[in-house]
Amino acid sequence: MFAIISSAKTLNFEKLAPKTELTIPMFLTLTNKLLSTLQSYSENQLSKIMNISAKLAHINKERFKDFDNQESKAAIFAYAGDVFNNIHIEKLTNHALNFLQSHLLIISGLYGVLKPLDTIKPYRLEMATKLNEINLTNFWQDEVTNYINKILAKQENKYLLNLASQEYSSVINPNKLKYQLVNVHFKENRNGKLSTIGINAKKARGAMVKVIANNLIDSPELLKNFSYLGYAFSTKHSSDNELVFIKS
């Protein structure tokens, strides 16, 4: 089984990461193609296409301009935000971290797909961002889907557990994915209607990754006992392809 999560806008390159053996992202040639486009934009253009402030546009213009000389860090330690903060990566044992390296993928607008210990440089590029004529979902879809097919073929339990947002999981082409996709939903009962509350769902996704790592879980079936923030598995609302956890 492999799980997928979305990359994060928030980064943490200030805090030192533990020393560990790092790996190289799979699709650097395609990443460099995107960088060439990003480097051609002015700060004002970056601000508009990314819908960010002038200050953030300046920061990212400088990052892209001198990208090769930027500091590198393992992806799992570089990303911050609600999902990554709730993995509590700094508390994982080396054994748990190594398990994640072979059971977790991070979907990225700039890198396509990353293993936890793949090195990245500071950047901002959401999957929904349009770069000239480049639709990032379409740009990455075949490459990422084919890559996932290859790595799942080597797994004993050939499941893809989707813990990513719709924006990022759309990079997986379900018509070309050869193995079972299992979507995970975290919902809450609000006025008699089941709804997804973004911030709580993100925290729960991160916590589920932590549970996968600490318990060496390689099957969706083993996640049905997961509980965090009051969420509990709902047999009634779930199916073979959908795991639904409801907060009472």
UniProtKB/Swiss-Prot annotation:
Entry's Gene Ontology BP terms: response to hydroperoxide
Domain of life: Bacteria
Pfam entry (one): H2O2_YaaD
Stretch forming the signal peptide: none
A GO cellular-component term linked to this record: cytosol
Sequence similarity: Belongs to the UPF0246 family.
HAMAP family the record matches: UPF0246 (MF_00652)
Full protein name: UPF0246 protein RPR_00055
Source species taxonomy: Bacteria, Pseudomonadati, Pseudomonadota, Alphaproteobacteria, Rickettsiales
